[in-house]
Amino acid sequence: MIKKILLAILLLPTLLYAQINTERVMTIARNALYFEDYVLSIQYFNQVINAKPYLYEPYFFRALAKINLDDFQGAEMDCDLAIQRNPFVVGAYQIRGLARIRQDKFDGAIEDYKTALKYDPENVVLWHNLSLCHMQKEDFSSAKEDLGKLLAIAPRYTRAYLMRGEVNLKQNDTIQALKDFDTAIDMDRYDPDSWAARAIVRLQQADYKEAESDLDQAIHLSVRNSGNYINRALARFHQNNLRGAMSDYDLALDIDPNNFLGHYNRGLLRAQVGDDNRAIEDFDFVLKIEPDNMMATFNRGLLRAQTGDYRGAISDYSRVIDEYPNFMAGYYHRAEARKKIGDRKGAEQDEFKVMKMQLDKRNGVTSGGNGKDVADNNNGDSGQDSSKTRKKSDKNMENYRKIVIADDSEADQRYKSDYRGREIGRAHV
C-alpha cells in the first residue's frame, strides 16, 4: 500500500507537467503542419490526443496532415472523431468531404458540403467543391443550381463561369458554354484555363483558326501545359498544317514524355510526311505503354513494310488478325508482305481470304467483324467516314489512320484535380 502511494506521488508531477504542456505541444504540432512537415506534426498531435482525447482540434489538424500524405481513409476517420467532439466546425466537414472525394465517395462528400454550408452559407470553396461533386455524378442540373448560388455570392469568381461552361458542354449547349467562357476571359484575360476552355468549344464547332488563336494565348500564359499543345496540334492538323502540328506534339512530349496522344498522333503525322523510322519509334513507345493496342500495332506494321522490314510487318499484321479475324486490310497487307519474302503460298491464302470476304459482303453475308472492301482503293482499306479523328476508346480497326482525341472520361479527370480544401490549414494554423 505504501509503495502504491509513493508511486502515485512520484508520477503526479509528471502527469501535471504533461497536462500543462499540452498547449505547447499543440503549438509545435501546428507549426510543423504549417511548414508542411506532416509526419512530425502527426507525432505531436498524437501526444495531445493521448493527453486530452476529448479535444476536437488535434483530430482535425491530424486529418489535415493525413490528407496531405494521401491517407484519405485516415483523414476521414479523424474528421469523424473531430465532428463527434464538435459538430459545428466547418473545416472538419470540408476536409472530410475532400477525403471522401479522393475515395470516390461523392454522396458522402455532398452531404458534408451541404452540412457545412448551413453553418457558412457564403463559403466559396464549399460551393465550388459541391458543384464539382454534382458534376462528377453527372447531376448537371444540381451543379448549375450550385454555380448560380456561387455566382450570386461571388459574381467575379471566374472558376464558376468555367465550371458552368463545362456543364453546358456536357448538356450539348455550346452557345451558352461559349458565353460563359467569354465572360471568364473578359473578367481575367490572364487566366490560361479560360482561353483553353473556349478553344475546346471552337474545336467542337470546327472553328479551327479561332481555336488555334485561343490556344496561342493559353500557351503564352502557361507554357508548361502539355494539353494545350496537344489541342493546338489538333487545330493545326485540321488546317493541314502538319509540320506545325508535329512541332506541337514535340513540345507536348518535352513536357510530358509519356503522353499517349502525343506519341500516337505524332507517329501518324510522321508517317504522312514520310518520316517512317521516327514514326516507328513513336508507335514502339505507344506499344510499351499499351502492348495490346492493335491500331498502333497495325500502323507499325505498315511502316515496317514501308521500310523493308517485311518479317516485322508480317508479325504485326498477324497479331492484329488474331485479334480481329475479319479485318480485311490485315489479310491484304500481310499478303503483300509475304510476296516480298517469297512466301507465295501464304500470300495466296491471304488473298483467297480477302476474295471470300469480298464475295460474302456482296452476297449480304456478314462476318460478324469489321471487314473492309479492298476493291474500294485496292489496298485493303475501305472508304472511311469524313471524320478525321476518333476517340481513344474507339476499337473499330477501320479507324486506324485517324488522329486520336481524349475520351470524355479522361477529360473529366480535371474535375478531380480542381477540388479545393487542403489550403484550409493555413487559415487555422
What are these regions (language model features)?
Residues 16-73, 77, 84, 368-376, ...:
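N-terminal leader/linker segments that initiate helical-solenoid repeat arrays
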Residues 21-23, 56-57, 90-94, 124-125, ...:
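Helix-start (N-cap) detector for alpha-helical repeat units in TPR-like alpha-solenoids
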Residues 34-35, 68, 102, 136, ...:
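Register position in tetratricopeptide repeats
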